[in-house]
């Protein structure tokens, strides 16, 4: 586009803005869309950079011609980071599709979902999708079919297909650490090589999986015996972050599949209370510890591991350590120094991020407790969702739809949090697991190439068992002033199914989705109060307290029965939902530099807590707290 053309566009846009002519706005956007398509075709024909256009700067009320000209620059380029080439994108707000969505949001923000259901009696039929044993109802969202078209258009303009291909082919898309994100390879059950670009990772993956199978089978069969010759009865997994959250969630979710002789405990917190509660009443002769730390230097894990080792040695002796401690790590020198035989160390790779690691040897505790056949079914479910994510069209693609809806509310409606509500008690730890997955992945303020974003990214994830939540935080969802999109996760049958329990649980889940959508308006409340016998001032006083505005969006995920395979698909569904958002926001979803600063500061503060001198090296608040604790502990 020439500069004269750009100036002409600016004058037309300025005129349209003053007249508030929405029809002309849409026409102008269509014109720009056609021009940018022509530019893209020309550039592709010349084997140059791909060129997508944007028509508006997100914050500009009256954009200057120069700003429009800038938005028309090529939106994809290749940055050199070390030896790794990473494709980066422009800010999402500079995309033409974003501008269209912004205009569309103005049309949608005042519409109640009651009206959307009234205008389309077959709305469920039009807004649900199925894959991998999951049915996703997204009809209770503040969208029309045109909204989905615009959102999927944004995904295409952001090159989501290309990024899916880069991830699945082993490109080092974690550009800040120059690493691949190949967790999909861990659940690739087909024969032959995983379709990764640089090397076939499957021989190593299959070798570790085989070792996991042999170990878990020995423990479950009673072949693995402790220092007294008794079989193992208790597994204590010591880790933190992804080395804890994933195994905790999966073993609780699949408790119905757990070996009848085995019990599992998980320790992650630096507060010794958690470790002591886990060890209380345990017999060292029948207890096996799994120490999960890639570097074997993680402070929380090593502190707990050393305390557990001390507890064990005091009761069983030093020579018994080798039969009761195994590790998931790559640091053979450190695990050997700890007393763990190299034969009992299970490795994983730097292309396995912590929050994606339950599929790897970090899942050793899962496989040991539920059995390797069930663990491999978990992997197969993840692979099922990988294939769906990779091949399904966007309007039928569960992870893509969930990621786009999340972005729709986060960036256009201003929603800050997202609540996850499993009506399957087995999934009680799933919201905790998703907190790390979503907030650590997309809680970023700069794009892959370090440019500050000018839009919100990531959501605050929270939640808990839905039936319990009804008696706790649902009040805020129904009558508060905050928009809170929600996910209802609903089984047709629970793991320990009884007709009465299941019907009560299902009726509550479905009623809540309807109540959040419809609410109860003033007319309906007034009629109900009159029918109850209330009149006059009493009625008028009660009326505003009984109104529920509704219009709270929700997705409902339904499955027949929670199995290892369904759980695998559900986990991978959310992984790919998160990745979809990261692509459109332009983020590196696989690093987590924000967690490092606090760790570094803790190393400074730890010796200061025992220092004989008054601490003055920090800000007044931190100094005051350190000195308060020193004095309270008798150090002066």
Please annotate each region the language model reported.
Residues 1-83:
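Amphipathic, low-complexity, repeat-rich surface-exposed segments
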Residues 90-97, 104, 109-117, 121-228, ...:
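Extended, charge-enriched "interface" segments that sit outside catalytic cores
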Residues 125-126, 245-248, 275-276, 299-301, ...:
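Short helix/loop capping segments that flank catalytic or ligand/cofactor-binding pockets
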Residues 549-552, 556-585, 590, 597, ...:
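C-terminal accessory domains/tails appended to large, multi-domain proteins
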Residues 478, 490-568, 572, 578:
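Substrate-recognition/cap regions that form aromatic- and gly/pro-loop-enriched pockets
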Residues 311-498, 519, 548-550, 599-606, ...:
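Active-site phosphate/pyrophosphate-binding segments
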Residues 214-222, 228-392, 604:
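Glycine-rich phosphate-binding loops that contact phosphosugars or nucleotide phosphates
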Residues 91, 137, 141, 198, ...:
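Hydrophobic alpha-helical scaffolding
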């Amino acid at each position: 586009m020439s500069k004269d053309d750009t100036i002409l566009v600016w004058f037309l846009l300025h005129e349209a803005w003053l007249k508030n002519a929405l029809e002309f706005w849409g026409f102008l956007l269509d014109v720009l869309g056609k021009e940018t398509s022509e530019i893209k075709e020309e550039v592709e024909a010349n084997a140059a950079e791909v060129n997508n256009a944007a028509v508006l700067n997100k914050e500009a009320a009256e954009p200057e011609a120069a700003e429009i000209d800038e938005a028309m620059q090529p939106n994809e380029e290749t940055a050199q980071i070390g030896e790794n080439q990473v494709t980066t994108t422009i800010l999402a707000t500079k995309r033409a599709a974003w501008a269209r969505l912004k205009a569309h949001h103005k049309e949608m923000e005042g519409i109640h979902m009651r009206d959307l259901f009234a205008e389309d009696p077959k709305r469920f039929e039009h807004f649900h999708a199925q894959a991998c044993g999951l049915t996703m109802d997204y009809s209770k969202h503040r969208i029309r079919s045109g909204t989905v078209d615009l959102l999927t258009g944004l995904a295409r303009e952001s090159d989501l297909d290309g990024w899916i291909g880069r991830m699945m082919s082993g490109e080092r898309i974690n550009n800040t650490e120059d690493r691949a994100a190949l967790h999909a390879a861990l659940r690739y059950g087909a024969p032959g090589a995983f379709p990764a670009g640089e090397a076939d990772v499957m021989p190593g993956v299959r070798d570790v999986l085989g070792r996991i199978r042999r170990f878990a089978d020995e423990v479950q069969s009673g072949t693995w015996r402790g220092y007294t010759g008794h079989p193992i009865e208790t597994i204590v997994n010591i880790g933190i972050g992804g080395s804890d959250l994933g195994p905790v969630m999966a073993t609780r979710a699949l408790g119905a599949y757990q070996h009848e002789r085995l019990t599992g405990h998980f320790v992650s917190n630096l507060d010794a209370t958690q470790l002591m509660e886990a060890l209380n009443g345990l017999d060292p002769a029948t207890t096996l510890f799994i120490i999960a730390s890639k570097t074997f230097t993680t402070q929380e894990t090593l502190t707990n591991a050393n305390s557990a080792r001390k507890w064990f040695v005091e009761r069983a002796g030093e020579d018994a350590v080798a039969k009761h401690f195994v590790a998931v790590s790559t640091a053979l020198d450190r695990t050997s120094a700890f007393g763990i035989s190299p034969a009992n160390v299970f490795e994983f790779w730097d292309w396995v991020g912590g929050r994606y690691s339950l599929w790897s040897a970090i899942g050793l505790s899962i496989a040991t407790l539920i059995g390797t056949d069930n663990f491999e079914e978990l992997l197969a479910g993840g692979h099922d969702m990988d294939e769906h994510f990779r091949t399904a069209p966007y309007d039928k693609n569960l992870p893509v739809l969930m990621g786009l809806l999340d972005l729709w509310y986060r960036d256009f409606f201003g929603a800050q949090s997202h609540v996850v509500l499993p009506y399957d008690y087995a999934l009680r730890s799933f919201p905790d697991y998703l907190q790390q997955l979503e907030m650590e992945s997309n809680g970023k303020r700069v794009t892959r190439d370090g440019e500050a974003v000018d839009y919100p990214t990531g959501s605050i994830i929270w939640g808990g068992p839905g039936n319990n939540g009804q008696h706790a935080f649902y009040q805020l969802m129904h009558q508060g002033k905050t928009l809170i999109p929600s996910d209802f996760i609903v089984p047709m049958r629970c793991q320990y199914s009884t007709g009465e329990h299941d019907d009560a649980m299902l009726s509550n889940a479905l009623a809540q989705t309807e109540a959040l959508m419809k609410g109860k308006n003033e007319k309906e409340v007034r009629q109900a109060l009159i029918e109850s016998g209330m009149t006059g001032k009493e009625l008028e006083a009660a009326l505003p307290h009984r109104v529920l505005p509704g219009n709270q969006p929700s997705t409902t995920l339904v499955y027949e029965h929670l199995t290892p395979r369904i759980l695998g698909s559900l986990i991978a569904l959310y992984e790919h939902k998160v990745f979809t958002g990261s692509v459109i926001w332009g983020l590196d979803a696989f690093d987590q530099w924000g967690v490092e600063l606090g760790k570094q500061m803790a190393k400074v503060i730890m010796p200061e807590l025992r220092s004989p001198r008054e601490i003055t090296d920090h800000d007044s608040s931190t100094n005051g707290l350190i000195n308060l604790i020193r004095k309270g502990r008798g150090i002066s």
